[in-house]
Amino acid sequence: MAAITNNPDKEKALGLVLNQIERNFGKGSIMRLGDAARMRVETISSGSLTLDLALGGGLPQGRIIEIYGPESSGKTTLALHAIAEVQKAGGVAAFVDAEHALDPNYSNALGVDIDNLLVAQPDTGESALEIVDQLVRSAAVDIVVIDSVAALVPRAEIEGEMGDTQVGLQARLMSKALRKIAGNIGKSGCVVIFLNQLRQKIGVTYGSPEVTTGGNALKFYASVRLDIRRIQTLKKGSEGEYGIRAKVKVAKNKVAPPFRIAEFDIIFGKGISRMGCMLDLAEQTDVVNRKGAWYSYNGENISQGRDNAVKYLEDNPEVADTIERQVREKLELGSLNFAISQTDDNEEE
């Protein structure tokens, strides 16, 4: 093999070809991987601080994200919180409601500015994905949510008879659309969130029988895949059920370590409990101490029981702000791993 030498003529030729590529295909079409702008991945908050930590900072901009899980596990709630966070920062959000099930009142309760939220309710999967592509190409939208992949019905299936067998139509539709959309997403910096449902594979003896809809293309194109599950129903005495405890596993993450887990409360009619997340992190960082059922702060007992501790923080915003500031200081100084449990899995299922 011939020796590789550092020839000035090669550097000159490289500079010329890079300039030619940028003239032909636009600035940023080719760059060195170590460029500062290339290495930095900006993020937006998911609406849950514990999940932001598990993600390594939040939902990455300019990437495709898939949120999947069983019914009533919090998929849409999580997506709406992400929309609310973008709008609070002055961004533009769009919601492609393929299921035709978006509730304006619930969205408003979660902090979504429904007056400025762009909503599309397409009849076919082709129309929905074309709308997404045009929104992303405009570079004027900061986040697009598609609810859901299972509802992206191909036009041929809608126009056909109910009993017709249409093999692989949706998978081919998703594969073609993602090939087209993926590059534009990276250039625009838009966050594109696909919500997905689970199905059961028949005759599976070993491994999980669960599979997401829409084929395998989304699994490959997504930079982040979040598996959200309901693990507990929250009850309060005679009042009955008032929420659920959700667990999110980061099944795939191309911008931070994967397989981390975050848990948070979702309160019916209110969404993710911000104070619940804060209390969990405050306990893990030793800002708030717990002995038995009692929670204490600065050596003084503040409440008995977790629900009462959350209510105390809600009723005392000044104390909550102080605790949040102390928690954030500790998170910036220390490792994030203490706030995130790790799974035993070493590969994506």
From Swiss-Prot:
Pfam families: RecA, RecA_C. Gene3D superfamilies: P-loop containing nucleotide triphosphate hydrolases. Keywords: ATP-binding, Cytoplasm, DNA damage, DNA recombination, DNA repair, DNA-binding, Nucleotide-binding, SOS response. GO terms for molecular function: ATP binding; ATP hydrolysis activity; ATP-dependent DNA damage sensor activity; damaged DNA binding; single-stranded DNA binding. GO terms for biological process: DNA recombination; DNA repair; SOS response. One of its GO terms (cellular component) is cytosol. Its main location: cytoplasm. ATP binds at residues 69-76. It comes from the Bacteria. It is found in: Cytoplasm. CDD domains: RecA (cd00983). InterPro entries: AAA+_ATPase, DNA_recomb/repair_RecA, DNA_recomb/repair_RecA_CS, P-loop_NTPase, RecA-like_C, RecA-like_N, RecA_ATP-bd, RecA_C_sf. Can catalyze the hydrolysis of ATP in the presence of single-stranded DNA, the ATP-dependent uptake of single-stranded DNA by duplex DNA, and the ATP-dependent hybridization of homologous single-stranded DNAs. It interacts with LexA causing its activation and leading to its autocatalytic cleavage. PANTHER family: MITOCHONDRIAL DNA REPAIR PROTEIN RECA HOMOLOG-RELATED (PTHR45900:SF1), RECA (PTHR45900). Belongs to the RecA family. NCBIfam families: tigrfam_recA (TIGR02012). HAMAP family: RecA. This is Protein RecA. The gene is recA.
